[in-house]
């Protein structure tokens, strides 16, 4: 299994269990999320509750909750929405922090192509949800989510050069 970590914070943000499609010259990975139901598991252990006097759930509050699989799996933390000005400020800080962490050709490609990726994201800002990794580290990678027209499940966008592949 491959896990993709944020180069800045080390937070796990994605794995190969979630296939991605490269867009914007490979600068952005697009991943389809899914709403799933978590909790409310009814376990039958073979006991006869009526014979044992335990017909009621005793103090168990096991509610079913709908979550987005990627957000739940990687414990992504949702951030407040932003306008274009705040978004540009945050993305510039991230680019400044990420660039020295990239090596040689990867760094050059990043410098040449990141502007196109930002221009791709900018018109979507009002429709995006913003997430960061579990540690909520300053200037770490942001994960963006939005709903394509007519979709009921969110699509996630990752800045690909900011991810480090780790074998588990």
Swiss-Prot record:
Subcellular location: Cytoplasm
Keyword Nucleotide-binding: no
Record keywords: Calcium, Cytoplasm
Domain TCTP: 1-168
PROSITE patterns: TCTP_1, TCTP_2, TCTP_3
GO (cellular component) term, any one: cytoplasm
The keyword Cytoplasm is assigned to this record: yes
Predominant location: cytoplasm
GO molecular function terms listed in the Swiss-Prot or TrEMBL record: calcium ion binding
Source species, domain of life: Eukaryota
Sequence similarity: Belongs to the TCTP family.
Reported function: Involved in calcium binding and microtubule stabilization.
PANTHER family linked: TRANSLATIONALLY CONTROLLED TUMOR PROTEIN 2, TRANSLATIONALLY CONTROLLED TUMOR PROTEIN-RELATED
Protein name: Translationally-controlled tumor protein homolog
Organism: Cucumis melo (Muskmelon)
Gene: TCTP
